[in-house]
């Protein structure tokens, strides 16, 4: 049905928003690969884990356990059963393994296969994800939050001069694997390069390079260029090489061959002059003979005659060595190029500190540092070093780590090679040395290119791997202890370690969270959340400001607004609307590509690293029809900096202005006019909005509402095109076109949720939207969920608001509200409370659920049935009995007289005590559901049988509706086949002698409807037609058998009994619907962070009112706006008022009988936009009437974030309403009727009721439980506690000298046990004076002193004596 709506967005968005739960659902699908054939499964997820741990070989290599494939079975219970019975929704896994036994030849050590055994083994269960992205663990819905973690790979950073007192900037580099040892290289203040493995003691970096197999000379060759010198007696010349420029003065005039002087003597050689020399072909220049002194030999310098080593490679050339070189007459000397402008001798200096000489000594040195306790041999050390970085069993960079390493070091190692190579380490050290010598910037660890998301699939995969590794150890031990030849694979494999790890992860991990299920939005945002906390992540205490802060790379990937306000600020964030996570775990944002400064339709996703270097234009840059920029200069982003660029430079363009914010921030209209702090509160508070009894769409929305509602899984969506065949409050039957549900003929039966208790106790119910016979298209909303109206999110209500002070009732953000809101149930919400009673087998006998409870009046039992369980629909109040239960008491020894009396009168009341389930304080409501769970073998009571009969009748009805819909569909198919076909014989009707059609007649649709389907086979003259009809009927029979089979299984489940925990005989769950009306103390909020508490509910007649008598619904304090800077609420107020007034204006025109054509034209003139013209022209008269009638409550407007209605547009619409042009009116005081002095801003604002409800927080105690040790009353609502009178309150009473009051507070009202009893006796007798005793906490103090060895005695007698003397 058409709805009048005005969309203010001007930017056309070509890309639809990806499904909001895509990350969760796809990640788990990839992990499980459930529908994929074992042979074609990719080496990821579960398959990858099995392949990485298997094959498992024993220590002697005589047997090998190999993995073949796995298979996932069907879950035993469906999701609803798991929730109601408190079970985990999981499926069994079976793995196929092969045990290969070898014969080993002792001499040659070659192996021959002796035996192969293959077997299918049950391998425990794995929790399954629901379509909504949740897991059901022990009956509660949980969400695994995606973790945001430092990416494996390599990172170069510096300490900003904070480490050393000299303030010198020290550079370091770290190689982080997915699993294995961390490798750190860092410089100290003396420019020595050290290496640390696993953050142990540091050693010179060259130790590691030597351990890798490099000699001293190899290292120098790799890291340093060679400077060549020619020595001719006292003249020293240096070879001119282009990249060996250094700052120095010319020793002589430097000339070209033609004699032209390039650099005069004693003048500095510039870079330009050096290039001229190179280009002029100058080979050598004469330098200061002393310039060789202080340089380092490139290789060993030897005496050409004797072979004596004058200086070893890397040695410093001193004056003595220089003189020796001249003596022996060496002509050519090679030194390290370390004195250039951008090179240094750091690595050579590190080498000089290195005491190791070869590979062996270096490997032993590393072994000593990492395993200080055990003495090494060369073989052990070599083995240890090999396993450190080069063995895939111990070290795994992961494909992400390899990808990052390749990208940063600019190398091309294949992604499959996931261990460290020599090239990786050598290049890393080279890049680090260049970085230190100021080549390029260090990396930014907070950039999203260096942080990756670990989604559900990966987190579960890691847990599975941990479990399998534990199991692997056990298997190896078993293989070595027993004779493998006699064993079968199932003797070796015990899946318990894996099950234990999974159970622990899903049940207790920091990332496995109880789903926030207050409303559909809170579900969606919880599943899109990213957390930097959790195992392997940060901790709240250690996380600094930089990690929490917004980073330029967050643009379009992580929302800068939505994050918690407390200690977790910035550590828990949300994905933006359009972002995706790629296979490597990096967050990507979509951009449109620009070619030759013209927009193309190509859309590409870029992660933070790939985006570097691109000039990105904003989504709101003006564009002509051809897709070219209209302005010569465009606002663009380049590497995070915003500036103006020529339009030719732009290479990418944002998709949509809302791509920078998350889902809940994108639901705030005029977000661009709100201060960020308030927008944060606004987006967080929408998640706390309680779904209301009656829902209504916001008059001012953003266009995101439909996406959230439909992707949340709370609505029922059409899975294909089709027709609604049946609908009532509890079920929907849809007859789809062919393509879905082929087994049941394309007919789908939807069970609607009713009275479903969410995790936060809100009532989740679904309401059908469309009547029977409505054709539906794929993706249409068939039924609305909680807080959803017409397939769009509707969490609050549109209220008439006035911004004015009113007698101090809106002081400090308080809210004054009209009684109409309470009377008409505008903000009434329903909450479901669940109570559970368990009857167990005790040592003294079984507990019994019964109505026969000792010492309880008939009045208390009035709502219980004969089994002792409360009836459906009963109104209950605190302390009412919900389920009667008696527990056997310990038998006491009876006297013979008592035994006789008991035998005569049958008084068993003393044997049992009343342990019934009662309603706790503060809960009043109606019983909406009762579930009774019995042991499979146990006896069923009447109530259980009634419930079973009711459930069976429901299944019967469902089955009949399902079959009826299938029959209709088959009839339609047959009608198409037999159209215009003659029948071969006369067709008789249902009544006696009634003839429907004579032989030879053509059958009509009316006749066809009268004939049972079974009779249509072989009815026609045409053989082909008969064949086609028979085929359709055969298909119909098969489908009916399948449908009956489905419902038979369901019926069996109803009657089969339940698996209860050991010792439990019966379990009863009672569900109570509590209606919470709006009351003083409830917290309410708008969408702009404007929150407050209801301070007073005023009668309608006392509220401020318009001159036409309409009273306000809500009065807010105008002082709450300027300092908070959330101007969005004012713009929403004005636009909402215009939307309401215009809707009422059009409806009034309809009521006064105005011609429809005139109303159509009026609407077009008012809105002046193409989409409104199209909508008005597409509606026929009846649809148009309905649309205008619906607009009586206001015309829905959509103002997308950063692309919404401008101020001019709002004032334009307000002007067209005819009620003033500045949004202010004169209001009248409801109490006196006088006008207020000033005109008041009024309008319509969307207000939410948050789940901080006063009814759930308020509580009162007269007497109640006491603490065991101190005997003082407990604290808190959950314990039914009292209020604590602390030391400060005591000081206040002391200051006023209120001695008697103080005595009462500190004794009888607190912890004077005997005093309490005496007090009661005195009150009963009517004596009104206080006799206080000793507080119990004083005794506790005395006992504590005794524990310290101090004996404390109270001197009562002496005190009395002294009093007597006085």
Swiss-Prot record:
GO cellular component: DNA-directed RNA polymerase complex
Keywords: DNA-directed RNA polymerase, Nucleotidyltransferase, Transcription, Transferase
Keyword Phosphoprotein tagged: no
GO biological process, one term: DNA-templated transcription
Catalytic activity entry: RNA(n) + a ribonucleoside 5'-triphosphate = RNA(n+1) + diphosphate
NCBIfam families recorded: PRK00405.1, rpoB
Function per UniProt: DNA-dependent RNA polymerase catalyzes the transcription of DNA into RNA using the four ribonucleoside triphosphates as substrates.
Subunit structure: The RNAP catalytic core consists of 2 alpha, 1 beta, 1 beta' and 1 omega subunit. When a sigma factor is associated with the core the holoenzyme is formed, which can initiate transcription.
Family, similarity comment: Belongs to the RNA polymerase beta chain family.
Official protein name in the record: DNA-directed RNA polymerase subunit beta
Organism of derivation: Maridesulfovibrio salexigens (strain ATCC 14822 / DSM 2638 / NCIMB 8403 / VKM B-1763)
């Amino acid at each position: 049905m058409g709805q009048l709506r005005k969309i203010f967005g001007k930017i056309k968005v070509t890309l639809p928003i990806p499904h909001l739960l895509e990350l969760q659902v796809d990640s788990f699908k990839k992990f499980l690969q459930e529908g994929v054939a074992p042979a074609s499964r990719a080496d990821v997820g579960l398959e990858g884990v099995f392949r990485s741990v298997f094959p498992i070989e024993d220590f002697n290599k005589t047997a090998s356990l190999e993995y073949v494939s796995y298979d996932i079975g069907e879950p035993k219970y469906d999701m609803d059963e798991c929730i109601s019975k408190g079970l985990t929704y999981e499926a069994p896994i079976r793995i196929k393994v092969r045990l290969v036994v070898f014969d080993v030849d002792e001499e040659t050590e070659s192996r021959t296969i002796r035996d192969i055994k293959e077997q299918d083994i049950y391998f425990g269960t794995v929790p399954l994800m629901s379509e909504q992205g949740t897991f059901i663990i022990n009956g509660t819905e949980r969400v695994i939050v995606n973790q945001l973690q430092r990416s494996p790979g390599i990172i170069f950073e510096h300490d900003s001069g904070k480490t050393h007192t000299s303030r010198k900037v020290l550079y370091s580099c770290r190689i982080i694997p997915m699993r294995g040892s961390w490798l750190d290289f860092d410089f100290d203040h003396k420019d020595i390069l050290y290496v640390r493995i696993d953050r142990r003691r540091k050693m010179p970096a060259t130790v590691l390079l030597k351990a890798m197999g490099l000699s001293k000379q190899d290292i120098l060759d790799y890291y340093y260029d060679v400077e060549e010198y020619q020595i001719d007696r006292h003249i020293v010349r240096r070879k001119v090489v282009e990249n060996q420029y250094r700052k120095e003065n010319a020793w002589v005039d430097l000339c070209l061959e033609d004699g032209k002087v390039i650099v005069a003597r004693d003048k500095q050689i510039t870079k330009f002059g050096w290039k001229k020399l190179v280009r002029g072909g100058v080979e050598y220049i004469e330098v200061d003979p002393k310039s060789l002194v202080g340089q380092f030999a490139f290789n060993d310098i030897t005496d050409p005659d004797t072979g004596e080593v004058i200086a070893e490679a890397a040695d410093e050339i001193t004056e003595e060595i220089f003189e020796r070189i001249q003596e022996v007459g060496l002509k050519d000397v090679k030194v390290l190029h370390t004195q250039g402008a951008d090179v240094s001798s750091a690595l050579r200096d590190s080498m000089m500190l290195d005491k190791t000489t070869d590979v062996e000594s270096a490997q032993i040195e590393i072994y000593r540092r990492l395993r200080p306790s055990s003495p090494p041999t060369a073989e052990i050390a070599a083995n240890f070093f090999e396993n450190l970085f080069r063995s895939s069993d111990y070290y795994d960079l992961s494909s992400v780590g390899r990808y990052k390493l390749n990208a940063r070091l600019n190398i091309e190692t294949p992604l499959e090679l996931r261990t460290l190579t020599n090239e990786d380490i050598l290049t890393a050290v080279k890049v680090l040395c260049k970085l230190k010598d100021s080549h390029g910037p260090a990396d930014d660890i907070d950039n999203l290119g260096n942080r990756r998301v670990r989604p559900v699939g990966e987190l579960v995969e890691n847990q599975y791997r941990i479990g399998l590794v534990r199991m692997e150890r056990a298997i190896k031990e078993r293989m070595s202890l027993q004779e493998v030849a006699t064993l079968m694979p199932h003797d070796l494999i015990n899946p318990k370690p894996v099950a234990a790890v999974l159970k622990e992860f899903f049940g207790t991990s920091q990332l496995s969270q109880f789903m926030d299920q207050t409303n559909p939005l809170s579900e969606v945002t919880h599943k899109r959340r990213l957390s930097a906390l959790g195992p392997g992540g940060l901790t709240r205490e250690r996380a600094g400001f930089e990690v929490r802060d917004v980073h330029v790379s967050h643009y379009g990937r992580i929302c800068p607004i939505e994050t918690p306000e407390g200690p977790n600020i910035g550590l828990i964030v949300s994905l933006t609307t359009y972002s995706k996570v790629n296979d490597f775990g990096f967050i990507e944002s979509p951009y449109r590509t620009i070619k030759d400064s013209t927009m193309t339709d190509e859309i590409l996703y870029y992660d933070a690293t790939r985006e570097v270097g691109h000039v990105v234009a904003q989504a709101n840059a003006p564009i002509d029809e051809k897709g070219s920029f209209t302005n010569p200069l465009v606002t663009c982003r380049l590497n995070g900096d915003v500036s103006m660029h020529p339009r030719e430079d732009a290479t990418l363009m944002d998709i949509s202005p809302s791509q920078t914010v998350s889902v809940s921030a994108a639901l705030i209209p005029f977000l661009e006019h709100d201060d960020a702090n308030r927008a944060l509160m606004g987006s967080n508070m929408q998640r706390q909005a309680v779904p209301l009894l009656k829902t209504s769409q916001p008059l001012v929305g953003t266009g995101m509402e439909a996406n959230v509602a439909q992707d949340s899984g709370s609505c029922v969506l059409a899975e294909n095109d089709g027709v609604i065949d049946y609908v009532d409050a509890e079920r929907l039957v849809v007859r789809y076109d062919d393509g879905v549900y082929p087994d049941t003929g394309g007919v789908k039966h939807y069970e609607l949720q009713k009275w479903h208790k969410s995790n936060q106790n809100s009532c989740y119910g679904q309401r059908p939207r469309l009547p029977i016979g409505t054709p539906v298209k794929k993706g249409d909303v068939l039924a609305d969920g909680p807080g959803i109206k017409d397939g769009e999110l509707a969490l609050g209500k549109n209220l008439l608001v006035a911004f004015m002070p009113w007698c101090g009732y809106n002081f400090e953000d308080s809210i004054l509200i009209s009684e109409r809101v309470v009377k008409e149930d505008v903000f009434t919400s329903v909450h479901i409370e669940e109570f559970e009673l368990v009857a167990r087998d005790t040592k003294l006998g079984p507990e019994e659920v019964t109505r026969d409870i000792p010492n309880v009046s008939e009045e208390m039992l009035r709502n219980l049935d004969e089994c002792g369980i409360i009836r459906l629909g009963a109104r209950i109040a605190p302390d009412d009995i919900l389920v009667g239960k008696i527990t056997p008491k310990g038998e006491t020894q009876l006297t013979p007289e008592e035994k006789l009396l008991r035998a005569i009168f049958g008084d068993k009341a003393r044997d049992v005590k009343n342990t019934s389930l009662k309603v706790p304080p503060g809960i009043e409501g109606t019983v909406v559901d009762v579930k009774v769970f019995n042991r499979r073998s146990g006896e069923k009571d009447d109530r259980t049988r009634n419930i079973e009969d009711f459930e069976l009748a429901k299944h019967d009805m469902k089955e009949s509706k399902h079959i009826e819909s299938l029959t209709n569909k088959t009839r339609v198919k047959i009608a198409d086949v037999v159209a215009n076909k003659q029948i071969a014989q006369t067709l008789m009707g249902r009544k006696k002698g009634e003839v429907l059609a004579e032989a030879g007649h053509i059958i009509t649709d009316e006749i066809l409807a009268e004939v049972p389907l079974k009779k249509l086979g072989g009815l026609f003259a045409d053989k082909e037609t008969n064949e086609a009809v028979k085929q359709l009927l055969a298909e119909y029979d098969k489908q009916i058998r399948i449908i009956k089979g489905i419902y038979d299984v369901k019926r069996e489940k109803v009657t089969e009994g339940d698996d209860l925990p050991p010792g439990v005989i019966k379990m009863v769950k009672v569900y109570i619907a509590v209606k919470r009306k709006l009351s003083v103390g409830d917290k309410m909020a708008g969408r702009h962070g404007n929150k407050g508490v209801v301070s007073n509910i005023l009668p309608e007649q006392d509220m401020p009112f318009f001159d036409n008598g309409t009273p306000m619904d809500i009065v807010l304090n105008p002082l709450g706006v300027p300092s908070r800077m959330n101007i969005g609420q004012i713009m929403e107020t004005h636009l909402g008022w215009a939307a309401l007034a215009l809707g009422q204006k059009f409806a009034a025109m309809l009521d006064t009988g105005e011609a429809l054509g005139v109303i159509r034209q009026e609407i077009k003139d008012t809105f002046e936009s193409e989409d409104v013209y199209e909508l008005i022209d597409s509606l026929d008269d009846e649809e148009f009437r309905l649309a205008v009638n619906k607009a009586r409550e206001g015309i829905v407007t959509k103002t997308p974030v950063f692309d919404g209605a401008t101020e001019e547009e709002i004032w334009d619409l307000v002007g067209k309403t005819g009620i003033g042009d500045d949004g202010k009116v004169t209001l009248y005081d409801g109490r006196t009727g006088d006008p207020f002095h000033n005109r008041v801003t009024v309008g319509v604002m969307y207000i939410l009721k948050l789940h901080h409800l006063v009814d759930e927080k308020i509580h009162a105690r007269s007497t109640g439980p006491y603490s065991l040790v101190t005997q003082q009353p407990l604290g808190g609502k959950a314990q039914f506690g009292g209020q604590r009178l602390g030391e400060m309150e005591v000081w206040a009473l002391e200051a006023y000298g209120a001695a008697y009051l103080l005595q009462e507070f500190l004794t009888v009202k607190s912890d004077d046990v005997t005093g309490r009893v005496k007090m009661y006796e005195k009150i009963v007798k009517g004596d009104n004076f206080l006799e206080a005793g000793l507080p119990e906490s004083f005794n506790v103090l005395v006992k504590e002193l005794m524990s310290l060895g101090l004996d404390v005695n109270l001197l009562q007698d002496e005190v009395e004596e002294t009093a007597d003397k006085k």
